[in-house]
């Protein structure tokens, strides 16, 4: 995704980026794409594979991606500032049991996150009281925020991992990953943060 706008520089030689759908480099969910940045040696090995299999972007997708890169910095700053504001507001919120966001002062690894990252990203995870039923009531009560298993769009998207992205796992496996029946993942968009919070508040019955 747009990790280079969030993570601080490190010594990695190779990197793979998701450009569309669940990544924020394009950030508008308009088509698939990926990019590999690597040493000349690795790129040389990949070039043969690419020539044989032909995984090339269509011209229109390449154009959309190139235009999206022009606004990446502005978009990521807004995604991250919105996400931090929402995470802070949801802590102690009636109907919310816990909130996870790497830049929250209450996060057990907040100091590590601050050393490794300049911003906390655009994804906020929290648990709605009432288990799976409570999570579904919340999701069905959303009006502005979209309900989907997609992430990284310009609009805010809420996902219920237990019944979508992680539904094939057993309940025990999900528990080990910290995914409870009431867990909701919120991919925070570019809307006014007050509008996002108002939709969350209404869905929680506030």
What residue ranges belong to the model's regions?
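Conserved PLP-enzyme active-site core in the AAT-like
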Residues: 1-94
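Conserved small-domain helix->loop->beta segment predominantly found in fold-type I
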Residues: 84-152, 169-171, 175
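Short, well-ordered beta-strand elements within core beta-sheets of diverse protein domains
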Residues: 65-74, 122-129, 185-189
């Amino acid at each position: 995704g747009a990790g280079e706008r969030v993570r601080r520089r490190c010594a990695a030689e190779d990197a793979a980026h998701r450009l569309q759908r669940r990544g924020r480099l394009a950030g508008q969910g308009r088509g698939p794409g990926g990019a590999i940045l690597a040493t000349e040696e690795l790129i040389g090995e990949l070039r043969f594979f690419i020539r044989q299999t032909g995984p090339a972007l269509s011209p229109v997708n390449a154009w959309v991606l190139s235009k999206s890169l022009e606004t990446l910095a502005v978009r990521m700053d807004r995604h991250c500032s919105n996400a931090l504001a929402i995470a802070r507001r949801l802590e102690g919120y009636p109907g919310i049991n816990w909130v996870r966001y790497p830049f929250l002062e209450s996060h057990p690894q907040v100091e590590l996150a601050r050393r490794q990252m300049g911003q906390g990203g655009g994804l906020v995870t929290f648990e709605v009281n009432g288990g799976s039923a409570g999570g579904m009531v919340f999701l069905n009560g959303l009006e502005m925020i979209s309900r989907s298993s997609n992430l990284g769009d310009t609009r805010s998207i809420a996902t219920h991992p237990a019944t979508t992205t992680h539904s094939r796992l057993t309940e025990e496996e999900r528990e080990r990953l910290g995914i409870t029946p009431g867990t909701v993942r919120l991919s925070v968009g570019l809307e006014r943060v007050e509008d996002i919070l108002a939709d969350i508040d209404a869905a929680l019955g506030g």
